[in-house]
């Protein structure tokens, strides 16, 4: 029986969980308000980082009732401890739908809404609720882009364990500047992605067609590659095939893949696009199919293109495939210059940029030691500075 005192302790197995019967009095923003037992000391006693409070609150029934009793919280936590033996299993258990053993995109929404509501680095969003869902969509896509290595749309315990996601959730508590958390949560990164999408989405229905996407970066990407992106090879749902449009969520994957072609997901993304027959290997025919358009575009710019045979020799020398006559996903992941390979076949601007650099300097760039910024982080930082400068110069980017 729980007495109505300000501070109570409950012993649960080996845990001593302090529970505030009248709220924790914390500025951290307990999701259940005044009567929520999830004070920081309770979370600490459970061995949970602060920003697990949302999932814990929902899992104990708080989402339905608006509050959580001590009894419900203890019963819920006992079940978690009995069934889950590490943080990844606990986190999946707290967020998943009953009867599942994996997480789908929607499962992350309550957790991320709590981050938006209570993280000091996102306090300015209180007045801009229309951006909540767009920021949350962006973070969810980044989570699945990095963590869901199987491309299944379902994050398993094993995938979560192999990722850095839970370490990043723990860092939310320590880092007041959310923009320092560049892997998933950075607001500046969201802002860059959303502004880039907004420029292309002229009717602002949060959908873009192939002509809209072709305008990205001044038509740098070939028509054949744009067609492949809209073929369904790298998008979810049937809207692409039915209506010829991709969503903002699809665009997040596209932009991160386009600006950083060295990550495993990005290499898989572009490999899927180039593998026209889906046989798991890029044939010489497939390479020529994409290179033909590059040659035509170079001709129109009065630049002499390398004959395909010469280009092919260069690329085979670059990738060093295991089997003759085809390039596999494994070959490209092993090669440190996958970005140069892909840009050669479908991004005219970046292809010309690589051509101006010596291969040795390209390799040196890719092998530099230390915590070097990723290509995506460099791009996002540069673009954010440009956006801020444009706004300061009186070209405000506004939400319609």
What positions do the PLM features span?
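HEAT/armadillo-like alpha-solenoid scaffolds in large eukaryotic assembly and transport factors
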Residues: 123-132, 178-182, 215, 300-305
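Amphipathic alpha-helical scaffolding segments
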Residues: 55-59, 90-97, 106-114, 158-168, ...
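Core solenoid repeat modules with strong leucine/isoleucine-rich periodicity
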Residues: 153-160, 168-174, 180-183, 187-211
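Long, highly charged low-complexity segments
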Residues: 1, 16-28, 169, 188-191, ...
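Primarily EF-hand calcium-binding motifs
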Residues: 11-33, 37-78, 85-105, 126-154, ...
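Polyampholytic low-complexity alpha-helical segments
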Residues: 1-33, 39, 45-60, 83-93, ...
């Amino acid at each position: 029986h729980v007495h109505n005192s300000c501070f109570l302790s409950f012993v649960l197995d080996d845990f001593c969980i302090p529970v505030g019967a009248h709220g924790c009095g914390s500025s951290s923003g307990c999701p259940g308000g005044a009567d929520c037992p999830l004070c920081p000391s309770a979370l600490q006693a459970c061995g949970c980082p602060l920003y697990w409070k949302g999932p814990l609150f929902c899992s104990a029934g708080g989402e339905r009732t608006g509050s959580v009793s001590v009894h419900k919280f203890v019963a819920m936590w006992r079940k978690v401890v009995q069934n889950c033996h590490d943080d990844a299993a606990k986190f999946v258990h707290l967020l998943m739908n009953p009867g599942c053993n994996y997480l789908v995109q929607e499962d992350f929404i309550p957790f991320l809404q709590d981050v938006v509501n209570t993280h000091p680095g996102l306090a300015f969003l209180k007045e801009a609720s229309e951006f909540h869902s767009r920021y949350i969509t962006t973070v969810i896509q980044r989570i699945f882009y990095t963590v869901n290595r199987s491309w299944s749309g379902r994050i398993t315990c094993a995938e979560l364990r192999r990722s850095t996601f839970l370490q990043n959730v723990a860092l939310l508590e320590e880092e007041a500047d959310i923009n320092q958390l560049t892997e998933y949560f950075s607001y500046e990164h969201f802002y860059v992605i959303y502004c880039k999408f907004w420029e292309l989405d002229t009717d602002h229905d949060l959908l873009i067609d192939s002509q809209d996407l072709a305008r990205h970066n001044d038509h740098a990407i070939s028509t054949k590659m744009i067609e492949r992106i809209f073929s369904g090879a790298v998008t979810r749902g049937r809207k692409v095939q039915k209506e010829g449009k991709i969503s903002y969520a699809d665009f997040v994957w596209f932009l991160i893949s386009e600006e950083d072609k060295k990550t495993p997901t990005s290499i898989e993304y572009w490999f899927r696009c180039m593998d026209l027959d889906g046989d798991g290997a890029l044939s010489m025919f497939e390479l020529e199919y994409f290179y033909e358009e590059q040659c035509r575009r170079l001709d129109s710019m009065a630049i002499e293109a390398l004959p395909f045979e010469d280009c092919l020799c260069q690329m085979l020398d670059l990738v060093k495939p295991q089997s003759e006559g085809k390039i596999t996903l494994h070959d490209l992941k092993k090669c440190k210059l996958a970005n140069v390979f892909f840009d050669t076949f479908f991004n005219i601007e970046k292809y010309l940029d690589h051509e101006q650099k010596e291969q040795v300097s390209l390799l040196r760039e890719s092998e530099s030691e230390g915590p070097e910024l990723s290509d995506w982080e460099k791009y996002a930082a540069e673009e954010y500075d440009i956006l801020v400068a444009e706004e300061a110069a009186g070209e405000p980017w506004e939400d319609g």
